[in-house]
């Protein structure tokens, strides 16, 4: 069966990046790594990485979306992945290697897709004021 795996082009720091991601994701598995290329798994998703010369830059056109069950998970991934990188709006961050991540609680999607448009709009308005998503504040906005 065919599979899709992200293939990441790093600018000479692939081994450092893979080691970093392996430390952040508790169930990470290193499949193989040599100085030029690595294969690893994060949360069951296979990734390939290439150690190459500076040529292509990561940008916001693609991001990795982490579904979180709890605020503790949101906090953990937000703090770990943003270390050395930067925070952005609406649950987005950029890690120290330039990759974009969306750290999003499942509850946000549930609230935004509520059939009551007024409740969903209040949740959207609250989210737009946040960098790291705060589930309690979303729930307050939802309740009115």
Q: What is each stretch, according to the model?
A:
Residues 28-59, 102-106:
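Conserved short beta-strand elements that form part of the metal-binding/catalytic scaffold
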Residues 5, 37, 89-90:
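Conserved beta-strand and immediately adjacent loop positions that scaffold enzyme active sites
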Residues 1-19, 24-32, 63-64, 107-144:
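N-terminal beta-strand motif that seeds the catalytic metal site of vicinal oxygen chelate
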Residues 4, 60, 87:
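Exposed loop/turn and edge beta-strand positions of beta-sandwich/beta-sheet ligand-binding modules
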Residues 18, 41-43, 54-67, 75:
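Serine endopeptidase catalytic core focused on the charge-relay Asp
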